[in-house]
Regions:
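Structured, contiguous alpha/beta core segments that scaffold functional sites
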Residues: 2-68, 129-224
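Extended assembly-interface regions of large multimeric machines
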Residues: 32-35, 39-133
Length: 224
């Protein structure tokens, strides 16, 4: 009987799973699709992003959500570095760790970490979280500058800089999907960025020209 009960329960579970997949009045509100996420948003991405930004500007609930998100994820002091380098005897290198942390704290100050000198690293963290939640993605570009004290810097790019209409099948087996060139294993290789913001009326001549940037110089975070 125990074997029969087990088989019966398995059949019941299978039956329930098939029922859940069948259309009925209980599931009419569920929108089903078999296409990829990229295909689903490819032709509507810019409009969806514009609507989300409008809500972030004008909807009190959306504004409050972004404020709470930044406050609870980043916090007042932000995410900080604590170096715990150890020597060959597994002892903490106090002097080296202090040197590393001091250098990090110096780089994190306003004027040192971004190419335009306008943000501190805490500001960057807040902007990262807000942009990710509002726009669905974040683009950060890496730069090695001539600054002798802090040569490495970052630049936040508006998501609109990425040409989502750039799509192409490559002969080598790779693809360009929504402005991102990838190899046959979907590893990002290059990013097709507009030379100027595509909606900036002051740069119409360059706004449609591309700057191809290596994926090694781009941090592209997005909500899947």
């Amino acid at each position: 009987m125990a074997i029969w009960d087990r088989l019966f329960k398995q059949r019941q579970r299978s039956k329930r799973s098939y029922i859940a997949a069948k259309p009925s009045r209980l599931f009419n509100d569920f929108k089903t699709t078999s296409i990829s996420a990229d295909s689903a948003i490819r032709f509507n991405l810019r409009e969806l992003r514009d609507k989300s930004r409008d809500q972030a500007r004008n909807n009190d609930y959306a504004k409050r959500y972004l404020q709470l998100l930044v406050t609870n994820v980043v916090g007042q002091k932000g995410i900080r570095l604590q170096s715990k380098a150890r020597n060959e005897r597994n002892q903490l290198e106090t002097v080296a760790n202090k040197f590393i942390e001091d250098a990090w704290n110096k780089w994190s100050k306003k004027g040192n970490c971004t190419v335009d000198g306008k943000l501190s690293f805490i500001d960057c963290q807040k902007l990262f979280m807000e942009s990710l939640a509002r726009d669905g993605e974040v683009l950060i570009r890496y730069f090695n500058t001539n600054d002798p004290q802090n040569p490495f810097k970052i630049q936040f790019l508006d998501a609109d800089y990425l040409d989502e209409k750039k799509n192409q099948t490559k002969k080598d087996g790779g693809n360009i999907i929504m402005g991102v060139e990838m190899d046959e294993f979907n590893k990002p290789l290059q990013y097709y960025l507009y030379a100027e913001h595509p909606n900036d009326v002051y740069f119409r001549k360059k706004s449609k020209q591309h700057e191809i940037v290596s994926a090694d110089d781009i941090l592209h975070a997005y909500m899947a």
